[in-house]
Amino acid sequence: MVKYKWSYLRILFFVIPILYGCSTPVSMIPPIREEPGIIIPRAILSEFDKFKVRRWKYIVIHHSASYKGSASSIDKYHRNIKGWENGLGYDFVIGNGRGSRDGQIEVGGRWNKQIKGAHAGDDEYNEYGVGICLIGNFEKNRPTRSQISSLVYLIKYLQRRCNIPKRNVIMHRDIKDTVCPGRRFPHYKLMARL
């Protein structure tokens, strides 16, 4: 009973408020692990569903192509090296334990402000695509189990919240000449879980 109570409280106090927008540019969500018997009460989700989100059509999956990192390190790179005024080009970043906790979902300022992304290299997908970046180089390694669990949770939430169909959950390579999110990314296994 205590285990389930903690899971319920974790969702109530950490996950739900952050997904519905906070005032800080990068927020953090504790890692979400698959645990049997966890049910997200509909009352909590419906309470926060009254917040308005802009029209989203796609979810675009990326990898950072780096061994380590976090939303703040990518934000710094995007601001200082690429010169992007709004910084972090993604809406969400999922950590691998090297730079941020394994499976930790970090929420970027673009999601909080509901503004256009800078992740797809294509106007349509930057404008209407929610960008999710997993830390790691999936040409060389696979994502961690915690990263995939958090990704599945986040995608399901976004599908429900933004009415995005499964066919519009796409890999960056589907829209741009790139290997992103890497050949070792378990695309088909991910799609089977959605």
Predicted regions: what is each one?
Residues Q114-Y125:
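Soluble, non-transmembrane domains of envelope/secretory-pathway proteins that act on or interact
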Residues V2, C22-V60, N96-G99, Q104-V107, ...:
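Basic/polar, cationic surfaces and motifs that engage anionic cell-wall
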Residues F51-R110, K116:
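Secreted/periplasmic proteins that engage bacterial cell-wall peptidoglycan
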Residues R10-Y20:
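Bacterial N-terminal signal peptides
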Residues V2-I11:
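Bacterial N-terminal signal peptides that target proteins for export
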